[in-house]
Amino acid sequence: MSQLPDELQVKEVSSGHWSGPNPADDPEGRDVVFSGQILAQMIMASDATVESQKEVKSIHAIFARAGRYSAGPVELAVESMHSGRAWASHTVTATQGDRLLSRGLVLLNTVEPDLMRHAPAMPDVPGPDKSAEGTLGVVFPGAEVRLVNGGDGVADDGSPASYLWFRYPESFDSVAANQAIVSWAQPGL
């Protein structure tokens, strides 16, 4: 398995309690923990708590206040609401000291083929090799972002739609790790 980014290597500190490290350097220079990092750490802590192989089907989080990189690691408390053979649901609370940062609900399901396949058609846009490289990888180091509508991400026709391609160069054996990577990057795109 490829090396996970340090921020996704949550460490168990006691039963149901995890510690999520912050980056060594503040990527944006604002001393504010990025929301995608907290979502990704919630996924990793929740996944580490389930006893059988499950994948995240959904995560919903409310952010109460900003965390600070200078305040130390994000502390994650995972409470199991239900844990069955096929489904599990967890409440994950992210704090720094006595400060509530976020509370999330994570729904997990056994890894199985999706029998319901419906989605809108992919847009007819140029592929990543014909798109301009973007600078949106600042919050998520190592990510490659390609902006279909040009270097600034604004659509040529002035419409509110922007298209981009996102790729992280590593792939992980863990479904949760791959989901965490996308969850980490998505709020910043």
Where are these regions (language model features)?
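Terminal targeting signals and extreme-terminal segments of soluble enzymes
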Residues: 1-189
